[in-house]
Amino acid sequence: EIHILEKLSIDGIITTNWDDTAERLFPQFTPYIGQEQLIFSSTYSVGEIYKIHGSYRDPKSLVLTEDDYDDFSKKNPYLAAKLITIFIEHPVVFLGYSISDSNIQEILQSIVACLDNANIQKLQDNLIFVEWTSDEDYAMTIERQDIMMANKVNLPVIKIKTHCFKEVY
């Protein structure tokens, strides 16, 4: 399935993975490692890889420990400010994350805090969560779902559930 992904025309990648899979699949993309690099760089939102939990190539960038995660959380508003344009202007597909993942929830909460209801609605077709199931006979489903954020705001997203990512690609 990963070979299908590398043939797709995508705008960019946001990942928490430390490995170099994204760079190997899309060598023409510019990687930004860690929140610091992303926050303080001039990005164009196209042809870029955002490695928000760091990279094994730069051990100081890794988000590993509880203290690292606390520091990551403190910087979420800055990260959200950088990502908000991407989320509004481009579809964002979340692979390998649960909608309930605490890191994703924190980032989305920071983004929602910057938007009024009208702009939150503009995100409804751009946030797509793909959930994998181990059931080989599962027929892919696509549904709209509201995520209740901590501030009691509903964030509309699209949820795809599948056993085979090939169908999604």
Where are these regions (language model features)?
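Short, solvent-exposed loop/turn segments at secondary-structure junctions
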Residues: 19-21, 55-57, 98-100, 135
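SIR2/sirtuin-family catalytic core signature
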Residues: 29-30, 38-45, 80-93, 98-169
